[in-house]
Amino acid sequence: MQTLKCVVVGDGAVGKTCLLISYTTNQFPADYVPTVFDNYAVTVMIGDEPYTLGLFDTAGQEDYDRLRPLSYPSTDVFLVCFSVVSPPSFENVKEKWFPEVHHHCPGVPCLIVGTQIDLRENKMVIEKLQRQRLRPITPEQGEKFARELRAVKYVECSALTQRGLKNVFDEAIVAALEPPVIKKSKKCTIL
């Protein structure tokens, strides 16, 4: 049985662990426990073939910046996560996570994953964001961002309601099995 390695990265508290636990157990975890490093495995059928999907959870906190890349070797696909109700975590996809992943694993496919979409319509969350002159990230913003960063795709989900959750991992599997061909830009040479 072939194994696919999927590593999940993103800021602390954006829902990476909940995403993985909800997907692998069909239950939303009750408590928040910051992750240092964890991994999970699920068997998925793709056509008639069984695959083991190895899911690697990582710590988003800066304290683990030197430790986290130790989980990167042999990765088949990255899920770069942010919370749709945390614009700073969205910015960090571009400022921190994409550069880190591409530095350590150039050419490995990446999906951008918007998490916590159930909170996008939450009145208390919206009011809190408005007090900071912020608003939730829209699907259109996520899709545009994915194009700009040349990610494979933008997907979003809620680990709480499981809306879009299976699709995130289905798309990750497709990206791992059929990585997109990276078009090299033509370099200008002056003689």
UniProtKB/Swiss-Prot annotation:
Please provide the record's keywords in A-Z order.
Answer: Cell cycle, Cell division, Cell membrane, GTP-binding, Lipoprotein, Membrane, Methylation, Nucleotide-binding, Prenylation
Disulfides per UniProt: none
Coiled-coil features, chain-numbered ranges: none
Q: What Gene3D superfamilies does the record point to?
A: P-loop containing nucleotide triphosphate hydrolases (3.40.50.300)
Which is one Gene Ontology cellular component term of this protein?
A: cellular bud tip
The terms under GO molecular function for this entry are:
GTP binding; GTPase activity; protein kinase binding
Q: Where is this motif: Effector region?
A: 32-40
Report the principal subcellular site: membrane
Q: Name the PROSITE patterns on file.
A: RHO
Pro-peptide region(s): 189-191
InterPro entries the record matches? Cdc42, P-loop_NTPase, Small_GTP-bd, Small_GTPase, Small_GTPase_Rho
Provide the binding site for GTP: 10-17, 57-61, 115-118
Protein's UniProt keywords contain Cell division: yes
Q: Which domain of life is it from?
A: Eukaryota
Q: Where is a lipid covalently linked (S-geranylgeranyl cysteine)?
A: C188
Compartments, as annotated in UniProt: Cell membrane
Regarding the membrane, this protein is recorded as: Lipid-anchor
Looking up CDD domains in the UniProt record yields:
Cdc42
**Which residue positions does Cysteine methyl ester occur at?**
C188
Q: What does this protein do?
A: Involved in development of cell polarity during the cell division cycle. Required for the establishment of actin polarization in germ cells.
For this chain, the family text in UniProt reads: Belongs to the small GTPase superfamily. Rho family. CDC42 subfamily.
Protein name (database record): Cell division control protein 42
